[in-house]
Design a protein with these regions (language model features):
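Beta1/beta-strand and adjacent pyrophosphate-binding region of the FAD-binding site
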Residues: 11-29, 51-53
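Short beta-strand to alpha-helix junction loop
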Residues: 69-72, 117-146, 194
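N-terminal FAD cofactor-binding segment of flavoenzymes
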Residues: 57-108
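Glycine-rich FAD pyrophosphate-binding loop
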Residues: 38-66
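Conserved Rossmann-like nucleotide-cofactor binding loop
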Residues: 29, 58, 192
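N-terminal Rossmann-like dinucleotide/flavin-binding domain of flavoprotein oxidoreductases
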Residues: 76-83, 91, 138-154
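Predominantly flavin-linked oxidoreductase catalytic cores and closely associated redox partners
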Residues: 36-39, 146-221
């Protein structure tokens, strides 16, 4: 029986034909990683497998389809993506924002953008609020995930519940599923993800970053 591990050297950090990559997190970080990794592999004439693990379906309305994060990005990012051939539709990029307003107990402060040309863009992270009647926009996260899939990535709708090492290779499993071994594991989840605990339990010195609690609220307009 042929060895399923494409690497004859367990200590190799180089991806080769047949290498398998797991990306935990299907938000922008995970989708961008998958998209550009597959693009670079194509340029290098490598055939690799990329699998994104994401429990949320970003095409769904209500909290179940939202990453629970504010949809604010720099327009520089939008322009850089366009230079890479990735054009975000108007249904995803809602509008440009000229300033922030900081409300405090001692008063209100308006924070203008430092350079007029470098505006801030608002995007929709989910597909819409729970009681939406007509969908007028698309999800930023769903759009990016779709680009990664079009590049060749596979999406598994499930929450990773186990991470271990199998003969020097990372192995992960979702609830009710069999462990899957990979050659590279990418952690592309947020600081609130329970996957942080799984990495800490691997006992290789990882410590979750310090965080500050933030309350984020969206208003339907």
């Amino acid at each position: 029986m042929a060895d399923s591990n494409p690497h004859p050297n367990e200590d190799s950090l180089e991806l080769v034909d047949g290498s398998r990559v797991a990306v935990i997190g299907g938000g922008p970080a995970g989708s961008f990683t998958s998209y550009f990794l597959l693009e670079m592999a194509e340029r290098a004439d490598l055939e690799i497998e990329v699998e994104i693990y994401e429990p949320r379906d970003f095409s769904c309305v209500a909290p179940g389809g939202c990453n629970m994060c504010g949809g604010i990005i720099s327009e520089t990012l939008v322009q850089n993506l366009a230079a890479e051939g990735i054009n975000l539709p108007d249904t995803v990029v809602q509008r440009g924002i000229e300033s922030y307003v900081l409300h405090m107990d001692v008063g209100t402060v308006r924070i203008e953008t430092p350079i007029d040309e470098k505006r801030i863009a608002a995007v929709y992270r989910g597909a819409g609020p729970r009681d939406i009647q007509v969908r007028k926009w698309g999800s930023f996260d769903h759009h990016l995930e779709g680009l990664a899939v079009a590049r060749g990535a596979k999406v598994t709708r499930g929450r990773v519940t186990e991470i271990s090492m199998d003969n020097g290779r990372p192995s992960i499993a979702v609830k009710g599923g069999e462990p899957q071994a990979y050659d590279l594991l990418v952690a592309a989840f947020g600081v609130n993800s329970p996957a942080l605990k799984l990495f800490k339990e691997l006992d290789f010195g990882y410590e979750p970053p310090e965080t500050t609690k933030t309350f984020i609220r969206e208003y339907f307009m």
